[in-house]
């Protein structure tokens, strides 16, 4: 088993290029963040065009298959049982309801269907329904992704045997900032689950949330962690905090949109073959800022009116923006010639 390791923070001055072999110290990533904006965007677009069609964006739809009542205390999350957000816990959806939602997602142009459950980890009694969902969605011709919390080795193997394409398990933030957001799950717990997913042969979807009050260096620490996973994730969702009433982070000041765009660009440069996804919080960006995100190297986004328990730009707005920018929806496996 390849054991993911926490990357140490280093403060020495560094060159602009990534040290061989593909190793990004936090100081390297900070240096990218601090480039003049136009230089950073130019470099990110160059890297993007080396590996991807710059005018193709993959569309994913996310469905909450089990909402609320989560044992974890993630400070950003409305689904935590530790927070009073007015969200009621629900049981796991039945398979037919999930497949109906997947059919609707495909009809709306999505090529990947992601299923999220709010719990610390799935129980064995859940696995038959979960694997049936995976098989059913794949039969519709969609890529499959699940985010179910921590996994045991056997659970990862069961999902792999069912044909799961991607498993999402975010690092959320840097190791240094992590303790200010979450106390019920360790950073190493997250890394261990990523190892189990890799060992089972499932592609990794792993990113984080920015705008939680972290510093730029701590944002760089998240990107460093992601880029130094061996290998780095095939799919990297970047979330812009949605400050939900009733959560500990409800009063957090919004992140400067240009800092969000910078984060997309830095993710593209440090993980050149990854699919970089605009995820939660996209509604907070106007059309011009979303266009900048695509220029910075984002080539996937969550598509649909709801992301778990937060709103998302309406599909008609997305289609209109694509038309204005000359962007087309693309199948995930057709995005890159080199991925």
Swiss-Prot record:
InterPro entries: Aldolase_TIM (IPR013785), BATS_dom (IPR010722), Biotin_synth/BioAB (IPR002684), Biotin_synthase (IPR024177), Elp3/MiaA/NifB-like_rSAM (IPR006638), rSAM (IPR007197). GO terms for molecular function: 2 iron, 2 sulfur cluster binding; 4 iron, 4 sulfur cluster binding; biotin synthase activity; iron ion binding. Keywords: 2Fe-2S, 4Fe-4S, Biotin biosynthesis, Iron, Iron-sulfur, Metal-binding, S-adenosyl-L-methionine, Transferase. Transmembrane segments: none annotated. One of its GO terms (biological process) is biotin biosynthetic process. [2Fe-2S] cluster binds at residues 114, 145, 205, 277. Pfam families: BATS (PF06968), Radical_SAM (PF04055). It comes from the Bacteria. It catalyses: (4R,5S)-dethiobiotin + (sulfur carrier)-SH + 2 reduced [2Fe-2S]-[ferredoxin] + 2 S-adenosyl-L-methionine = (sulfur carrier)-H + biotin + 2 5'-deoxyadenosine + 2 L-methionine + 2 oxidized [2Fe-2S]-[ferredoxin]. Its EC number is 2.8.1.6. Its cofactor is [4Fe-4S] cluster; [2Fe-2S] cluster. Binds 1 [4Fe-4S] cluster. The cluster is coordinated with 3 cysteines and an exchangeable S-adenosyl-L-methionine. Binds 1 [2Fe-2S] cluster. The cluster is coordinated with 3 cysteines and 1 arginine. [4Fe-4S] cluster binds at residues 70, 74, 77. Pathway: Cofactor biosynthesis; biotin biosynthesis; biotin from 7,8-diaminononanoate: step 2/2. Residues 55-282 form the Radical SAM core domain. Homodimer. Belongs to the radical SAM superfamily. Biotin synthase family. Catalyzes the conversion of dethiobiotin (DTB) to biotin by the insertion of a sulfur atom into dethiobiotin via a radical-based mechanism. This is Biotin synthase. The gene is bioB.
